[in-house]
Amino acid sequence: MKCSKLFILAAVLFFGTAYGQKSSKPKPTKEEVVYKDTDKVDKEVDFSKGGMDGFRELLASNTDLNKIDGYEDFPEEEKKKIQKLISENKPTPSVMLYTTLTFIIEPDGTMSNILAEGENQSFNKEMERTLKTIKDKWIPAEIKGKKVRFYYNVPIKMRIE
């Protein structure tokens, strides 16, 4: 009995000490700093295949519209009306979808931390998927001739008809 109490006390002290330690978050190194402000960099980012126009064209051509439900935010009654129009091959109302793609352009020109934020979740998901499939690199931002990480966002709007 005395031995089991001693064992329990030792276990409590051990786990209390092990899990009671404050974990300190390491400060980011200079290479982990992500710049957001174009005023802070000497050379801004650019897409290697045709600049922003080339990037938008590549994004549009790789987007699978079948994976986007433009009407997902509509009330059920409206969805049923639209489905009926589709089944009768009648024109359906067009929908404008918006999202903002955010990502980090790494010093090697690749993208990381890809996120799409907007109201339509299927559109967000497809934009994230599409962006992850793009293997062409960016021309990274530079400060004093050194390539740096740069936070970038691209607003996207698409009309679904």
List PLM regions with ranges.
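Charge-biased low-complexity segments
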Residues: 4-8, 20-161
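Hydrophobic h-region of N-terminal signal peptides that target proteins for export
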Residues: 11-19
